[in-house]
Amino acid sequence: MIAAQDLRKTYGPTLVLDGVSFALARGQCLALLGPNGAGKTTLLRLLATLLRPTAGALQIAGVDALREPERVRPLLGVVAHGSYVYEDLTAGENLRFWETMRGGDASPARLAAALAQVELDAVAEERVRTFSAGMKRRLGLARVLLAEARLLLLDEPFTGLDRRGRKWVNEFLLAFKAGGGTAVVATHSFGGSLGVADRIGILGQGRLLLDRPAADLSPEELPRLYESLTEGAEATP
């Protein structure tokens, strides 16, 4: 579904990503761990075709995403940290606006179905400024459902959520994978990573220091391995 090869990104003299390579098949999830400034968000933006790499190659669904980004963007669902919702609109109005902007089907029945899938149908007419962090995250994921995305890119989906909220995101990702979706999740959550990921990646100083099957890592081993690999690593701006 997605293959990144030797992705590099520089800003002037600063090297942000240094030869990142990985591949995921349909229905797989990569959890990307790393300290603040490791390059996780930059990598997600490259995968979303929002940034161009300085060097490297990227294929999504067999398409050269760097040459033809417009062909792969309809396949992508991007939920950034903070979710980018419109606080003064209701949940339903947010979805209607997003679908109208992308030229999608903004019919009331379709919007209601998406809100029901993320358990927000009961608050469809409430303004988003009253929502918790978890509810805003779910609203962002409703956009993914409406867009019928096949590759989901999530930046810190567990941050600011309580245990119930983290469990809900895990269940959403498992269902997304079961339906054939592929996901890359940038996170600080060890537990969340092992709960949904097929592969665990650890990013440090712009390099992928580890890429291993999640099944090979225990809940006790992963934090120790993370600390040993990232200890003393300076954050990449």
What label would you give each PLM region?
Residues 33-35:
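The feature captures the beta-strand-to-loop junction immediately N-terminal to the Walker
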Residues 96, 100, 106-123:
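Conserved ABC ATPase "signature" region
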Residues 48:
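Helix-to-loop junction immediately C-terminal to a conserved catalytic motif
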Residues 187-188:
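H-loop/switch region of ABC-family ATPase nucleotide-binding domains
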Residues 152-155:
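Catalytic Walker B motif of ABC-type/P-loop ATPase nucleotide-binding domains
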Residues 56-64, 72:
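Conserved ABC transporter NBD signature motif
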